[in-house]
Design a protein with these regions (language model features):
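Beta-strand elements of well-folded, non-transmembrane domains
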Residues: 110-114, 130
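Short beta-strand edge/turn micro-motifs at domain boundaries
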Residues: 123-150
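A short hydrophobic beta-strand element
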Residues: 100-110
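Solvent-exposed loop/turn segments at secondary-structure junctions
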Residues: 52-55, 60-62, 109-111, 145-149
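A solvent-exposed, acidic/Ser-Thr-rich amphipathic alpha-helical stretch
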Residues: 23-24, 42-100, 119-121
Length: 152
């Protein structure tokens, strides 16, 4: 009987480890943005956003509220002339609001080769709201802005 209890306990623990917490799921889904950013695949990036997402890119002058606008932003920003690209998030903090909503704030920077030289853009500040819709975590709010220089 005790061995049966141990077996059941291990089975339950194994099942629990299969299901990640909302924080880890949302962070993993958001990492896909950085992976896609390096590919110049605009459609892949847009698929990470909810159809009703609110979007402020670094160069956005107005709030973007449609997938076509988000795609247009990345078509312009990711012109394919960037050479090899690396996108690195850091200092990320996640706040779980519910089982299906997580806010992530942090910084990130991109590095690319241009004319044989490494060029770094950033670090930028970034805040996103991730929402689980069905089985997918999607970006429902995105705001990116340059990090201000410290006061002298």
């Amino acid at each position: 009987m005790p061995s049966r209890i141990v077996l059941i306990a291990f089975s339950l623990l194994a099942c629990a480890s299969v299901f990640a917490e909302p924080k880890e799921d949302a962070l993993a889904a958001y990492q896909k943005f950085f992976d896609a950013f390096t590919t110049d695949n605009h459609d892949q990036i847009v698929r990470l956003f909810a159809p009703d997402a609110l979007f402020y890119g670094t160069r956005s002058t107005e709030l973007v509220t449609a997938p076509e606008g988000i795609r247009a932003y990345f078509v312009e920003a990711l012109s394919g002339k960037r050479g090899s690209v690396k996108a690195t998030p850091f200092e990320q903090t996640a706040l779980v609001l519910s089982d299906s909503v997580v806010v992530i704030s942090g910084k990130w920077q991109s590095e690319r080769t241009a004319e044989g030289k490494m060029v770094t853009a950033g670090p930028s500040r970034n805040t996103v709201v991730m929402q689980k819709r069905g089985e997918r975590w999607l970006i429902v709010q995105f705001h990116n802005s340059p990090t201000p220089k410290p006061a002298p």
